[in-house]
């Protein structure tokens, strides 16, 4: 998978400034995962957010236009090859239908929104090795009957 040029530029500027996505939360008032999605063009910024981000990264104002354009959703091959991303694919391959069944038992026939959605990543200390804790929260949308 090739990383878009704008993504490479944004990531390099962030690295050059010694910033993390968590550092940018205070500047933009958005979650670190949402900000990372901006970098990868999976989300778009408001004009004000784009100005703040470009300023924080020390980039030319010409990047504002790119950050406010409609995003391109979905990046990379259908079956991901990056090991970390592949684990999520594998998790859904193994647990996707079981998760679906449990959601339907609790909510009924419908889906979890990825639009009215938040995702948090936390680090949990564990004596056997640090753990990754991911919390997804999406609005339940029942299927309409007509």
UniProtKB/Swiss-Prot annotation:
It catalyses: cyanate + hydrogencarbonate + 3 H(+) = NH4(+) + 2 CO2. One of its GO terms (biological process) is cyanate metabolic process. Signal peptide: none annotated. Keywords: Lyase. Transmembrane segments: none annotated. Its EC number is 4.2.1.104. Pfam families: Cyanate_lyase. GO terms for molecular function: cyanate hydratase activity; DNA binding. InterPro entries: Cyanase, Cyanate_lyase_C, Cyanate_lyase_C_sf, Lambda_DNA-bd_dom_sf. The keyword Transmembrane helix does not apply. The active site is at 87, 90, 113. Belongs to the cyanase family. Catalyzes the reaction of cyanate with bicarbonate to produce ammonia and carbon dioxide. This is Cyanate hydratase. It comes from Nostoc sp. (strain PCC 7120 / SAG 25.82 / UTEX 2576).
């Amino acid at each position: 998978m090739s990383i878009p040029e704008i993504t490479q530029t944004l990531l390099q500027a962030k690295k050059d400034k010694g910033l993390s996505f968590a550092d940018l939360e205070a500047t933009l008032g958005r979650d670190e995962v949402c900000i990372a999605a901006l970098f990868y063009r999976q989300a778009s910024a408001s004009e004000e957010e784009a100005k703040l981000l470009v300023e924080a990264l020390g980039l030319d104002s010409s990047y504002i236009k790119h950050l406010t354009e409609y995003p391109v959703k979905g990046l990379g091959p259908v079956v991901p090859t990056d090991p970390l991303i592949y684990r999520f694919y594998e998790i859904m391959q193994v647990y996707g239908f079981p998760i679906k069944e449990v959601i339907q038992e609790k909510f009924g026939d419908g889906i979890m929104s990825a639009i009215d959605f938040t995702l948090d990543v936390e680090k949990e200390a564990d004596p056997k090795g640090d753990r990754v804790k991911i919390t997804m929260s999406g609005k339940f949308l029942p299927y309409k009957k007509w």
